[in-house]
Amino acid sequence: MTQYFRSLAFFLLPVPATAMACDGWPSWARGACQRVDQIWNEGGNDLYLTGYSWHNRAMYSSDKIRSFNELAWGGGLGKSIYDEDGDWQGLYAMAFLDSHSDIEPIAGYGFQKIGRIGADTRLGIGYTVFLTSRSDIMSRVPFPGILPLVSAGYRDATLYATYIPGGKGNGNVLFMFGRWEF
């Protein structure tokens, strides 16, 4: 459990530092810095709940499927905004049980183009860029990633899904989680 808290602290400690002034940043990175600063300082608070990961049955043996944990329980916190174009942008930090029932911390940035279906309903498509750590990949050394991200939302609740690609016997996982704006 101590390892879990160390991993989570690794991801959470840099987050408040993003609220610094962006003037000293190179011009090519200043826009990203300013957006992160805006999300951190002006964004609403989010509660994330994880709960399901589906392993593609065509890529694993039935014995291997039975060994996997597909109830990826966990949660986290984040901050997000709907920008001047109506698109969603957010920062998040979560921890959940991975396929081997080990705790996986993750922290990152998400972006989605949002299509509105009425006043309260929306669909989104975009991506997430993140840093994570897994016991079965590089012995918990944090590593970056980028994944597609789709969503369906109603009022303050949004359901997200991403697909982790892979080969025969690894990856190929549909991961679903939710976000509640408060």
Curated annotation (Swiss-Prot):
Protein's UniProt keywords contain Signal: yes
Leader peptide range in chain numbering: 1-21
Annotated Pfam families: PagP (PF07017)
Entry membrane topology: Lipid-anchor
Site positions (Role in lipopolysaccharide recognition): 64
Main enzyme class: transferase
A GO CC annotation given for this chain: cell outer membrane
Annotated GO biological process: lipid A biosynthetic process
Lipidation residue positions, type S-diacylglycerol cysteine: 22
Keywords associated with the record: Acyltransferase, Cell outer membrane, Lipoprotein, Membrane, Palmitate, Signal, Transferase
Reaction catalysis annotation: a lipid A + a 1,2-diacyl-sn-glycero-3-phosphocholine = a hepta-acyl lipid A + a 2-acyl-sn-glycero-3-phosphocholine; a lipid IVA + a 1,2-diacyl-sn-glycero-3-phosphocholine = a lipid IVB + a 2-acyl-sn-glycero-3-phosphocholine; a lipid IIA + a 1,2-diacyl-sn-glycero-3-phosphocholine = a lipid IIB + a 2-acyl-sn-glycero-3-phosphocholine
Subcellular location: Cell outer membrane
Subcellular location, principal: membrane
Lipidated sites in chain (N-palmitoyl cysteine): 22
Residues annotated as the enzyme's active site: 55, 98-99
MF annotations from Gene Ontology: O-palmitoyltransferase activity
EC number: 2.3.1.251
Domain of life: Bacteria
Function (record text): Transfers a fatty acid residue from the sn-1 position of a phospholipid to the N-linked hydroxyfatty acid chain on the proximal unit of lipid A or its precursors.
Quaternary data: Homodimer.
Family the UniProt entry places it in: Belongs to the lipid A palmitoyltransferase family.
UniProt name for this protein: Lipid A acyltransferase PagP
